[in-house]
Amino acid sequence: MTGASGNVMDCFKNAFGAVGEICARAPGRVEVLGNHTDYNEGYTLSCAIDKEVYVAAGKSEASGAFELASTHFSQTVKVKTVEQQRENAWVNYPLGVYKVLKDRGYPVGPFKLAIDSSVPLGAGLSSSAALEVATGLALSGLFHFTIEPAELAKVCQKAENSFVGANCGLLDQFSSIFGKKNHVLFIEYRHLEHETIPIADPDLTLAVTISGVSHSLVTSAYNDRRKECFGAAEYFHKRDPKKTALRDVSMEELKAA
């Protein structure tokens, strides 16, 4: 293997002294239109980018432990109990995906995992969602089960919500799974419908610039904004039970409140 896939397989072999049984990848994403609109049952426009997370995986049933390595971190992490890790917090993303899959009855077991990423960390390009999706794809191949793409997105979102502690919507995971080259992705969140729209103009280029400002859903005010949005939705729902999300509230109603 060459490139990023070769890097992650080398990482696996260096960390665990064996060849990874399977390799999976998932792209980061850029948000074109829509911010905090996914969990308010609104609409977004996004696209996948040409930076990806690669995951190599193998079973570790003999030891019963979970072992994780990354090209971005020097330490190989070994855990026997699947619980949130305060140190080496990056392992919470794949461990969370495992836990949600296990809780939902998928036949997953202990694993060894190596990670390589060209998605800049903390740049707001959803490296965490790409890692979750790549982990889910790797585990489905490793343990021989099928999972529908939309269900995988929900599994990854649940992992980030309940295990990592970031109350994200589905924008990031959906974009990583359904994004397509030279297309933007339109997502409607009340019914979870999506459409890939071709970029018709061949001369159109979407440039993404790294600002240098680090971003984290866990430590930022993201969870506070979500709580505030849900509080506002509850306010309007009490006055009109038909309004179940901020999507249902007009600008005039917001201004009047």
Predicted regions mapped to residue ranges:
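Gly/Ser-rich oxyanion-binding loop with an adjacent helix/lid
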Residues: M1-I22, P27-V30, G34, N40-Y43, ...
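C-terminal nucleotide
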Residues: T2-R29, Y54-E87, H183-A257
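N-terminal cofactor/phosphate-binding cores enriched in small/glycine residues
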Residues: G34-H36, A48-I49
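Short amphipathic alpha-helical segments with coiled-coil-like heptad repeat character
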Residues: Y39-E41, H237-K238
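Short Gly/aromatic-enriched secondary-structure transition segments
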Residues: E41-A48, R225-R226
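Short, charge-rich binding segments
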Residues: S46-A48, A56-S60, G105
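Short, amphipathic alpha-helical segments that act as regulatory/interfacial helices
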Residues: I49, Y98, F230-A233
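Residues at beta-strand starts and edge strands
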Residues: K51, G109, L113, D203-T205
